[in-house]
């Protein structure tokens, strides 16, 4: 699944081809995605794109009259193509620009979506989201306060979008390893120092992933078709049975909140 760095990479990749240009039309080939594509999108014409941004794992295209909001789901991607490029069977939506470029959305599993909102402040999917992990609002004091009385595993806590957005499975695994915390550690038992370290490492890991173009998983490509390169730097995710990079102990895995979790039993004692 594309996580925050992958969505940020996608945003950065398509911005030069969209920002400041007019949308000629939006072609919706398959409206039945995770949530049905907003019917307003097919009516958009001659609207200028004024900016692109991201909230959590949502890609936001700002126009003069409202906002096109996309989520890449489990296997979705966006890329820049021209009218000459053939359409794939999983190419569900095109945003056709007046500069000859097309932003094409491909999603084999159809778990993504494209929606319309006239007002971001009232957009229902954003109302209960926590702070952005790279913002000043996400700090040690905030995380420690949120962790009090929480009896859930710390990995669940970090992946709760009402606590902080965009820390998905890959980066939760990596961060907990860097902090020496077992994924099943009870959240309420976190110390202030541990919360401070978590905040530091989450920010560090996400920034590094963004700089390197997202994580190379089987489905993720950058908008120009190149893979991300951060998977080469992952220390523990997906490496069950491999030696821990710190101590050499075999990496183990377990399921936490229906997601695979990887940890070193020596470095991350419960």
Curated annotation (Swiss-Prot):
Where on the tree of life does the source sit, at the highest rank?
Bacteria
Q: Which SMART domains match?
A: Fapy_DNA_glyco, H2TH
User: What's in the keyword line of the UniProt record?
Assistant: DNA damage, DNA repair, DNA-binding, Glycosidase, Hydrolase, Lyase, Metal-binding, Multifunctional enzyme, Zinc, Zinc-finger
- Name its co-factor(s): Zn(2+)
- Active site per UniProt: 2-3, 57, 259
Q: Which InterPro entries match?
A: DNA_glyclase/AP_lyase_DNA-bd, DNA_glyclase_Znf_dom_DNA_BS, Formamido-pyr_DNA_Glyclase, FPG_cat, MutM-like_N-ter, Ribosomal_uS13-like_H2TH, Znf_DNA_glyclase/AP_lyase, Znf_FPG/IleRS
Q: Where does DNA bind?
A: 90, 109, 150
Q: Where are the zinc fingers (FPG-type)?
A: 235-269
Q: Give the signal sequence positions.
A: none
Q: Does the keyword Flavoprotein apply?
A: no
Q: Which reaction does it catalyse?
A: Hydrolysis of DNA containing ring-opened 7-methylguanine residues, releasing 2,6-diamino-4-hydroxy-5-(N-methyl)formamidopyrimidine; 2'-deoxyribonucleotide-(2'-deoxyribose 5'-phosphate)-2'-deoxyribonucleotide-DNA = a 3'-end 2'-deoxyribonucleotide-(2,3-dehydro-2,3-deoxyribose 5'-phosphate)-DNA + a 5'-end 5'-phospho-2'-deoxyribonucleoside-DNA + H(+)
| Alphabetized GO MF terms | 8-oxo-7,8-dihydroguanine DNA N-glycosylase activity; class I DNA-(apurinic or apyrimidinic site) endonuclease activity; damaged DNA binding; zinc ion binding
| Textual note on the cofactor | Binds 1 zinc ion per subunit.
Q: How does it assemble?
A: Monomer.
Q: Which family does it belong to?
A: Belongs to the FPG family.
Reported function = Involved in base excision repair of DNA damaged by oxidation or by mutagenic agents. Acts as a DNA glycosylase that recognizes and removes damaged bases. Has a preference for oxidized purines, such as 7,8-dihydro-8-oxoguanine (8-oxoG). Has AP (apurinic/apyrimidinic) lyase activity and introduces nicks in the DNA strand. Cleaves the DNA backbone by beta-delta elimination to generate a single-strand break at the site of the removed base with both 3'- and 5'-phosphates.
Protein name (database record)? Formamidopyrimidine-DNA glycosylase
Source organism per entry reads Mannheimia succiniciproducens (strain KCTC 0769BP / MBEL55E)
């Amino acid at each position: 699944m594309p996580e925050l760095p992958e969505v940020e990479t996608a945003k950065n990749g398509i911005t030069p081809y969209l920002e400041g240009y007019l949308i000629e039309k939006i072609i919706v080939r398959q409206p039945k995605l995770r949530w049905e594509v907003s019917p307003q999108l097919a009516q958009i014409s001659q609207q200028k794109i004024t900016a692109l941004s991201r909230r959590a794992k949502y890609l936001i295209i700002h126009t003069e009259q409202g906002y096109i909001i996309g989520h890449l789901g489990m296997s979705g991607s966006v890329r820049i193509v021209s009218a000459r490029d053939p359409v794939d069977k999983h190419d569900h939506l095109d945003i056709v620009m007046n500069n000859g470029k097309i932003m094409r959305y491909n999603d084999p599993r159809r778990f993504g979506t494209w929606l319309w909102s006239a007002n971001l402040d009232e957009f229902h999917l954003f109302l209960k989201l926590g702070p952005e992990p790279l913002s000043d609002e996400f700090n040690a004091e905030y995380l420690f306060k949120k962790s009090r009385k929480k009896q859930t595993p710390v990995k669940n806590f970090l992946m709760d979008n009402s606590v902080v957005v965009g820390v998905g499975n890959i980066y939760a695994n990596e961060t907990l390893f860097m902090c020496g915390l077992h994924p099943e550690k009870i959240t309420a038992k976190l110390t202030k120092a541990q919360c401070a370290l978590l905040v530091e490492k989450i920010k560090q890991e996400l920034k590094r992933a963004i700089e390197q173009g997202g994580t190379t998983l089987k489905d993720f490509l950058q908008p120009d078709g190149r893979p991300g390169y951060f998977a080469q730097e992952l220390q523990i995710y997906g490496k069950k049975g491999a030696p821990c990079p710190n101590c050499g102990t075999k990496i183990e895995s377990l399921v936490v909140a229906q997601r695979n979790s990887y940890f070193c039993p020596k470095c991350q004692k419960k």
